[in-house]
């Protein structure tokens, strides 16, 4: 098959190189090297599960609808892409939580997992498909609405600097959960260690 599609494969490789070329040129001009090492490292044997559950930027805490993305992985039976989605999800999450600088800079939630959303839409759709034909569909859709509301409200809190970009802790998070106007007493909790 590779031999019969040699021209298409060469075109794809060339197009990929052209897409990457501006980044390589930028790195060469700015750093003097075509490949730039940011200086961090991987901790594959000691992954940082706080990426998923931590009060600082936990994916499931600040983007709670993603819990349903993961739940959908259990409802993909008989889907032709099931194995690909499972392998991608497990590898991608493991790679993201193994990065030494697990907070990924000042940002909202776990920005390093955003690129996974198109793939995770498949198990989420499988979950919706399965639940929508049961008596649990209305409670499920209410739950989806609530999780979406929490996510959007927290984005608003982040944009208003109620949620700190890098220094959140459990006590402060609980004090400002769905609270548009934190008090000075709440803000003092932000300075405490978790």
Please identify what each model-predicted range represents.
Residues 1-8, 70, 74-81, 121-143:
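Membrane-interface junctions at the ends of membrane-embedded or membrane-associated helices
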Residues 3, 30-31, 78, 99-100:
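Short helix-capping/hinge motifs at transmembrane helix termini and TM-loop junctions
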Residues 7-72, 85-96, 117, 146-157, ...:
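Membrane-lumen/periplasm interface segments of specific transmembrane helices
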Residues 56, 63-64, 74, 120-121, ...:
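Aromatic (Trp/Tyr) and acidic
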Residues 59-71, 135-137, 165-171, 188-194:
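Juxtamembrane/interfacial segments around transmembrane helices
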Residues 62, 66-67, 106-129:
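Hydrophobic/aromatic-rich transmembrane helices and adjacent perimembrane loops
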Residues 98-108:
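Interfacial helix-loop-helix junctions of multi-pass membrane proteins
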Residues 143-194:
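Membrane-embedded, lumen/periplasm-facing catalytic core of multi-pass transferases
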């Amino acid at each position: 098959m590779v031999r019969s599609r040699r021209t298409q494969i060469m075109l794809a490789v060339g197009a990929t190189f052209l897409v990457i070329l501006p980044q390589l040129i930028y790195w060469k001009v700015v750093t003097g090297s075509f490949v730039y090492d940011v200086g961090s490292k991987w901790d594959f044997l000691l992954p940082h599960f706080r990426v998923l559950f931590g009060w600082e930027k936990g994916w499931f805490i600040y983007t709670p609808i993603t819990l349903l993305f993961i739940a959908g992985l259990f409802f993909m039976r008989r889907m032709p892409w099931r194995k690909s989605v499972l392998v991608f999800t497990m590898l991608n999450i493991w790679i993201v939580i193994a990065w030494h600088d697990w907070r990924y800079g000042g940002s909202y939630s776990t920005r390093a997992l955003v690129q996974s959303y198109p793939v995770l839409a498949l198990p989420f759709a499988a979950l919706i498909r399965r639940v929508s034909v049961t008596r649990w569909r209305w409670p499920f859709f209410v739950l989806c609405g609530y999780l979406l509301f929490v996510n959007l409200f927290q984005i608003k809190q982040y944009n208003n600097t109620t949620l700190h970009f890098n220094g959140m802790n459990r006590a402060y998070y609980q004090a400002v959960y769905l609270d548009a106007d934190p008090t000075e007493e709440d803000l003092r909790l932000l300075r405490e260690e978790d």
